[in-house]
Amino acid sequence: NEELESIWDSIEHSMDGDASHFWVAESDVVDALVRIALHRPQLPKSIDIAGRRRWSTQQTHHELQMLYDRTRAGSTGQFTASLLDQPASPKISVVPIDAAQQDMRPSLGALHNVLVECDGHGWQPTSPLRTAMMVYLAGKLND
């Protein structure tokens, strides 16, 4: 799939040591937006939506690479046990707390409060990032 190869190349070329992201699954975002649309609460001027956990570019790359390799192997019939014999993801390491090096997660307070007002449940993303990445890859392969 040329589009996936292009995305993959851009990820590999943009890997710098300090970049990080607070990924969240599309399904969790859609769920929050539908809850807001159904209940029509009073909204603040802006609402940030983000995942709870910080993912470095390297962790994201590692996870996508593993899933992509498995997907390609499965689609070509060349699936081996070695593709399943990988450590659990993500590769998490202890990072010293240094405000200069840490990206600040967007505040989820406004989103949480609006969702509590809607139905009492607040912001509770339920989809693991690995699942969201698999859905993304499947969609790209089916395009």
Model-derived features: positions:
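A diffuse structural propensity rather than consistent per-protein peaks
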Residues: 25, 55-56, 107
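Conserved short-loop catalytic and cofactor-binding motifs
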Residues: 17-21, 48-52, 120
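Donor nucleotide-activated moiety binding/catalytic core segment of transferases
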Residues: 104-115
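Catalytic cores of transferase enzymes with a strong primary signal for eukaryotic protein kinases
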Residues: 106, 120-121
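Helix N-cap / beta->alpha transition motif
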Residues: 25, 82-85, 114
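NAD(P)-dependent short-chain dehydrogenase/reductase
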Residues: 1-35, 64
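Mid/C-terminal beta-alpha module of Rossmann-like enzyme folds, strongest
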Residues: 32-103, 125-143
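Extended, small-residue-rich solenoid/repeat segments and analogous flexible loops
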Residues: 99-100, 117-120
